[in-house]
Amino acid sequence: MHKVLTELRDREILKDISNEEKFLSLPKNSGVYVGFDPTADSLHLGNYVQIVNLIRFKKHNWNALAVLGGATGMIGDPSFRSTERVLLSTEELLKNKNKIKSQLESFGLKVFDNYEIYKDISFLDFLKNIGKLINVSYMLAKDSVKDRLAQGLSFTEFSYQIIQGYDFLHLYQNQDIFVQYGGSDQWGNITTGIEMISKVVGDNHKAIAITANLLTDSNGNKFGKSTGGGNLWLDAQKTKPFDMYQFLINQPDSEVEKLLKWLTFLEISEIKDLVNKHNKNPKDRLAQKALAYEVIKDIHGKSAAENCTFLSEMLFNLSLDLSKVTLENMEFAYNQIESFEVEKGVNLVNFLVENKILQSKRLAREFIASKSLKFNYEPIDEDFSVSSNYFEGKYATLHLGKKKILICKVK
């Protein structure tokens, strides 16, 4: 049992544990769970931190369970929020649940929907049998609740911690789940579950709360937001893998070792060696490249990670050997960065101007004069007609100046 705790400490992830002595005495194959509310139709990079840690438990032979918040998602967690969440419609919640369940299962995790606990419990039975297990004064003492009282807190949101707490009791009694794990902002909700368990089972219960430090960026904001402030989604249709790759490869040197420890399964010794090599020549961004590759590989697969690595090189290497680039690389690139379709044989400069890819022929001539208008890395002139000798004639690269590259699909 101690091995997973040692790993969480070595990776500087562990924040709090309610009773370490009790944790170390738990039987083999004990269960641990993390909750994921279906507030959107995809999980995001911030959620991925907890997915990775749940997988760490699984690798250490724990019975790891992802709890899908079909019930809690109907209410919305008020913890440390300044405003009440907008409630989801039944149809939207169902759609979100199905997609998130598939995402969690894609990581090899077992998934349990907490709606199954409550679907046959009447409101009066809930008050009679569950509500009596917790005191209002105990709930009001939670920082996550106190912070909202001044702004107003509905009974709906106030009851969230009762449901999350009862989840823990139910899983403890029915599935031998003795540990609930979550971010440090979940401490109040998790310990509510332990309070309920102690009321039912007694003080000799085995329930443990474990929380992780919140992963933040260099500005102290929650990690996983794009430059524009939006979430970086795990769904490739919502966030392109290459956009996530670029986000990771642009992380500052001051953060990259922490991110390698938190977001990858590389051994600590590997990470230290990698960071030492990186520090000898930081401009090569060796650590950031490893971070981006590992995370994309674990989320989207090895092929996507290799294609992202290629695409990054293509964007920033002005002398790339196209003979080493595959058709699969180009098909991937076409769907990841700015691209367009063009018919074989047409005058390329005219096409670019007519389709507003270049603003004017004057600008085209400036690029041509500086040899920075390139088709498949070769400078072209104003009379060039589209034809690609690479990638089975189906794709080509187009450089507009020194910093912009597009992918052409040749029809």
Swiss-Prot record:
Provide a Gene Ontology MF annotation, just one: ATP binding
List the coiled-coil residues. Answer: none
Show where the S4 RNA-binding domain sits.
Answer: 346-410
Q: Which UniProt keywords apply?
A: Aminoacyl-tRNA synthetase, ATP-binding, Cytoplasm, Ligase, Nucleotide-binding, Protein biosynthesis, RNA-binding
GO BP: any one term: tyrosyl-tRNA aminoacylation
Q: Where does L-tyrosine bind?
A: 33, 160, 164
- Motif mapping: 'HIGH' region: 38-47
Catalytic activity as recorded in UniProt: tRNA(Tyr) + L-tyrosine + ATP = L-tyrosyl-tRNA(Tyr) + AMP + diphosphate + H(+)
Biological role: Catalyzes the attachment of tyrosine to tRNA(Tyr) in a two-step reaction: tyrosine is first activated by ATP to form Tyr-AMP and then transferred to the acceptor end of tRNA(Tyr).
Q: Quaternary state and partners of this protein?
A: Homodimer.
In its UniProt entry, what is this protein called? Answer: Tyrosine--tRNA ligase
Report which gene this protein is encoded by. Answer: tyrS
